[in-house]
Amino acid sequence: MTQTENLTAAAPPAASPVRVAIAGATGYAGQELVRLLARHPHARLTMATGSQATSAPRKLPALARIFDGEVVPLDLKAVGQAADVVFLALPEAASADVAPVLLAAGARIIDLSGAFRLRDHAARAKWYPATKALPAGVVYGLTEFAAAEIAGASLVSCPGCYPTASLLALQPLARAGLLRRDADVIVDAKSGVSGAGKAPSERTHFCENHGSVAAYGLFGHRHTPEIAQALDCDVTFTPHLVPLDRGILSTIYARLAPGTSAAQVGEAMETAHAQSPFVRLTGDALPEIKHVAWSNFCDIGWRVDEASGRIIMVSAIDNLLKGAAGQAVQNFNLLIGADERTGLL
């Protein structure tokens, strides 16, 4: 049975649309959330806010006729009263403060920041010092590997964009025991400039970025411990900024367990993603960013060198959709009992 043939539909959600709000609706990921949720058949977008209580009210011209409401200042009491599910597209320090308040008000949370991704206290203190503790009921929301947990979660912590592209490729092999303990995993990733956020900087300035490719965050990127946490092994991760508006291409190198064949790798990937509607396994046909841009798909290809026991994998996603807003809506669908494809195809 092929990957596509094996997909099954989820139970239908409740008849009434779920009230949703977005905090941080003016950033790149936030605006994608507005676009997706304003047209979602099982969601009623009741409020979209800025990232601060002092944010000036504003419209979103790019979303005219899709969402003609106003993005208002962040008022936690009003958000808690207006929504049953709240999407947080805020900086991690703001999410760390806001989420407990909204949880106490009875809302379920889907958080796009890194505030609640790391389980280890020491790692969290190093990379996300604003997060003092993980709220009860938090689930790491890599959709393809946590569907049951997400359905019952009070807080879904969506993975980062780079970890999403990396783990959808590597986790099937790790779970099948096909990676060596000392797998020497290397992730070499290229991202469009929207991954750096909307705040202007020299690094994302047109004159600096256009016609160039630059590495950054060597041995110092907060997505490294997130990838390593899921794989339970050391990871070397190097991101690069490329002159594209959106998209991530990750080239991944690893050592396979002794005796692992190319056929075993293919079987592990097919088995792991048989029920993954947004993962497209391309095998020898290597993915490209242009094939996934403006979609919620993750394309994964690979080559195995059985003689050396090494594998090279290539994965591609749209960083703002599968790496952020699209994955968040996919998790929302699971949260409300809808088919996870709803509003994304």
Locate each region found by the language model.
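Conserved glycine-rich beta-strand-loop-beta hairpin in the small C-terminal domain of fold type I
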Residues: 246-250
